[in-house]
Amino acid sequence: MTDTFDLTQSTLVERFLRYVRIHTTSAEDSETFPSTACQLDLARLLAEELKQLGLADAEVDGYGYVTATLPANLPPEEAARVPVIGLIAHLDTYHGVTGENVNPVVHRGYGGADLALPGDPEQVIRVVDNPELQDFIGDDIITSDGTTLLGADDKAGVAEIMAAVEYMVRHPEFKHGPVRIGITPDEEVGNGTKFFDVAKFGADYAYPLDGGSPGEGEN
């Protein structure tokens, strides 16, 4: 029997690889919000996928914010006592390096050597410059092919949220209170919360999933 963790990890990776291929670079000098129309392509896709998972109120508002609610699956009296938890990520990517036509590469079973990126022989991720690579020997590592950025900031967070929602929907034995989902545009240009309606979002506590090592957290 396949382990549930393996299934969840497989779903997470599949989502991440799809999302990074969607161009969502934000722009510093734009007078629109979101700053680039391409961000709405991923926003609409995420809202549709959330609806398909049963989150009926999933929507993209006029500013490009994706929000949705995963209702509690606790008895009503218990659900009323627990806090509403928010999960937040941003869908735009950094404008300083091209994020169009991203070709992700999965390096299976990393062996500990420098990582050569196949799209550009001059692009090598060297262990001497990135000693943290040694913490991931034996794991799969995902990079771009070297011709673009990857977009893990923050499509890794987006994929984590979507995979977590899917897991909770498909595993009702995992009990939880109300969960609010918020995915924002334009974080990379400093405007991720510019039109974010905190009161409407309605979370008692919210956690941004954006960067960091496994298990790392900040207040």
Language model features with spans:
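Short charge-dense sequence patches
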Residues: 1-4, 16-18, 108-116, 180-182, ...
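Acidic/His- and Gly-rich active-site-bordering loop/insert found
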Residues: 3-141
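Acidic/histidine-rich catalytic neighborhood of metal-dependent amide-processing enzymes
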Residues: 133-219
